[in-house]
Amino acid sequence: IFANTTNPRSSYGEGIALAAQAGAVLTDMEFIQFHPTGLDFGLDPTPLATEAIRGDGAYLVNQNEERFMLGIHPENELAPRDLVAQNLFKQIEQGNSVFLDCRKVSNEFETKYPQVASYCQAAGLNPKIDLLPILPVAHYHIGGVKTDLEGKTSIEGLWCCGEVAATGIHGANRLASNSLLESMVFGRIVAKNINSLPIKKVNKINPDFIRMHKEKTKNRIRAKKYIWQLRSSMMRNIGIVRNHSSIIRGLHDILKIERESKGLSAKLNDMILVSKFIIIGAYLRKESRGCHLRSDYKNTEDNFILHFDLKFSDLDSKITEILNLADNANHKQVVN
């Protein structure tokens, strides 16, 4: 649901949307991890340049070949992902281009990083000679459907694992490769728990529901315009750095897209729903923590050591409350 993302097009929040509409509690929806080194080769999804390349001696530089991470963190280019992504974003906001400088990396680049080498070759770039253009990209959703450590959700009989689940194991930020815990470890736990349950007779799916779903997907070509508008707005307003104004703009954008695209696409409906939850979470967390950065609340606050649990049934009232508060604040500014 972000314009710049490593996620495949088949990953658009459907699992979270389905669980939410069934009544499941969602949590930590505001925490989206952005990977700093997506290869800016005009591809969708964006291919990644692994951190291992920086560990092997690659630098992050701007168009003046200045290493902008020097002095930011003791580990320089190997600082935590969120910090690197934020500083890449800052460079871009200042009008700079950002690059991965691999010219001092091992001569065995093609052997050690064949996938990255392949993308470079297709783009007409040689990592031994050329700077590789990069940009930060949406990579991993830490929030999702709230589960316990057995994979149980708030709904009896509904289990979740993988990126759709919010188990709490990542806190407010994710360490590289810890997604394996959510996919492989919790996948196994959930499967074992489900298999241990007595077999129940399942009711047949209502054919009217199937027809309704097909009806919602018949205008896919028209929906593409709105899907891109949504992704662009989410990246621009709810991306790496957020603030009150951008969050409200993002919410207005999503509501406008929802009004104009009614009935066009089930996929778009799911994207709109998940975007709303992310926006509400970002609005409520008036601090910066982990991969959630607000430029208007830069500090981490003790009174926000908590989770924001959200439900589909509360969505409209939450949105109305946020918009009313924003309107009142704007009115006071005009009066003053």
Where are these regions (language model features)?
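Short secondary-structure boundary/hinge segments and terminal tails
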Residues: 36-38, 137-138, 304
